[in-house]
């Protein structure tokens, strides 16, 4: 998890792009983790959980079939390896290596630590003008990822926000100081998310936190919604309707009636992906082949690329290499068969979380909220960049809670016991 925040020194494209393979420190660490899990399984130290095998095997199989059926197998091979890494090998390694609640607590604690570190650095960037450029000023918080991965920091901080929210809900059990400390941490994370100016992360986080609060206490969810609305009105009043944060928030409401160029490009990419799937409904055009078919199916309104700028990487123009919708990306590149594999995996995790639900267990709350965040975020974003490995780790952690842990010790400091069998 810590390696995810190590700067890669170069731009990366989303999963399924045609810009080559970007290997990050997180990828190297994940390879070591997968190798360690494989050695333990081969030596008989740990056994492959049957439920996890049945959840991940269909996705691996459909990825293999759609890759073999690709018009350009050589191009699709790297995409196959990447998708298997993120959606199969890394989560499965986490399921195999996490033994009990203490191990699961270490995973979530490391995510929280990374998120707080990125948040503090992002806030410093925004306040000192060292962030990514937006509106001609370098005030957008991007953390250690830089403008070339402009969405990465908001995802990491969003994941950390989910973890700390779950811990904050059970904080009263651990002393009077636990609640203000948790609230202070949430304040830091929330400020960084606002300064990241990521509309997609705001929407997905609102849905995930809303689900978490409703599951924990419906009355608390209502009070939290009222407080957030009041704080929003105060913020708008203080900013006088100006400022990048208010403008980005207002652009969410205007994304249908008056979309900006970014949203308009997204609509055109969605339409292109839909047309590709219509012509290749079963196995798609092959993983990583969306860019090769994009211009054939997209309208002339589509921009030639997006612009990024920051003091470290300078000005860069990046081509639009994916539809910015994971579901449409899967349908266009892997067809209905590929989507069936992903639905099987995510459905197994959701069903496992439902059957082992315990709204008083922070680990269950994190697993459910992360899954909701992912499902909502995939509606207008796709997998890409250095946060892929972190997503795979958290998917594995959610699967641990969904499928049951191998050992069930009593709760350690700061942990709450729940149903895991």
Predicted regions and their residues:
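Transmembrane alpha-helices of multi-pass inner-membrane enzymes
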Residues: 365-421
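A conserved mid-to-late transmembrane alpha helix and its immediate loop/hinge
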Residues: 190, 306-351
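Interfacial juxtamembrane loops and adjacent helix segments
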Residues: 256-263, 288-327
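Loop-to-helix entry and N-terminal half of a specific, functionally important transmembrane alpha helix
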Residues: 321, 325, 344-345, 350-380
């Amino acid at each position: 998890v810590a390696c995810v925040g190590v700067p890669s020194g170069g731009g990366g494209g989303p999963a399924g792009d045609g810009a080559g393979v970007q290997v990050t420190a997180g990828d190297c660490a994940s390879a070591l983790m997968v190798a360690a899990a494989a050695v333990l399984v081969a030596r008989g130290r740990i056994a492959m959980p049957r439920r996890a095998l049945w959840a991940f095997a269909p996705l691996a199989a459909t990825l293999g079939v759609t890759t073999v059926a690709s018009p350009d197998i050589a191009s699709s091979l790297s995409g196959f390896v990447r998708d298997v890494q993120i959606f199969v090998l890394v989560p499965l390694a986490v399921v195999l290596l996490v033994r009990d609640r203490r191990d699961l607590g270490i995973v979530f604690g490391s995510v929280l630590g990374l998120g707080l570190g990125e948040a503090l650095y992002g806030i410093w960037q925004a306040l000192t003008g060292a962030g990514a450029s937006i509106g001609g000023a370098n005030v957008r918080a991007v953390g250690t990822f830089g403008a070339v991965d402009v969405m990465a920091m908001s995802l990491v901080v969003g994941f950390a926000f989910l973890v700390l929210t779950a811990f904050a809900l059970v904080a009263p059990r651990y002393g009077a100081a636990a609640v203000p400390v948790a609230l202070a941490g949430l304040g830091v994370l929330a400020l960084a998310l606002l300064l990241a100016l990521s509309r997609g992360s705001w929407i997905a986080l609102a849905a995930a936190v809303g689900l978490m609060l409703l599951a924990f206490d419906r009355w608390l969810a209502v009070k939290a919604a009222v407080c957030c609305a009041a704080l929003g009105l105060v913020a708008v009043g203080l900013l006088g309707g100006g400022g990048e944060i208010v403008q980005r928030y207002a652009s969410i409401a205007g994304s249908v009636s008056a979309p900006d160029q970014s949203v308009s490009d997204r609509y055109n990419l969605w339409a292109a992906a839909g047309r590709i799937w219509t012509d290749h409904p079963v196995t798609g055009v092959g993983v990583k082949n969306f860019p090769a078919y994009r211009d054939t199916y997209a309208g002339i309104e589509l921009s030639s690329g997006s612009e990024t700028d920051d003091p470290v990487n300078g000005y860069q123009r990046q081509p639009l290499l994916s539809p910015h919708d994971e579901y449409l990306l899967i349908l266009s590149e892997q067809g209905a068969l590929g989507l069936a594999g992903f639905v099987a995996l995510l459905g197994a995790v959701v069903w496992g979380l439902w059957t082992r639900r315990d709204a008083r267990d922070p680990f269950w709350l994190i697993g459910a909220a992360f899954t909701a965040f992912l499902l909502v975020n995939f509606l207008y974003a796709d997998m890409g960049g250095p946060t892929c490995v972190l997503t795979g780790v958290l998917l594995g952690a959610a699967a641990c809670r969904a499928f049951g842990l191998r050992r069930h010790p009593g709760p350690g400091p700061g942990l709450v016991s729940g149903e895991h069998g």
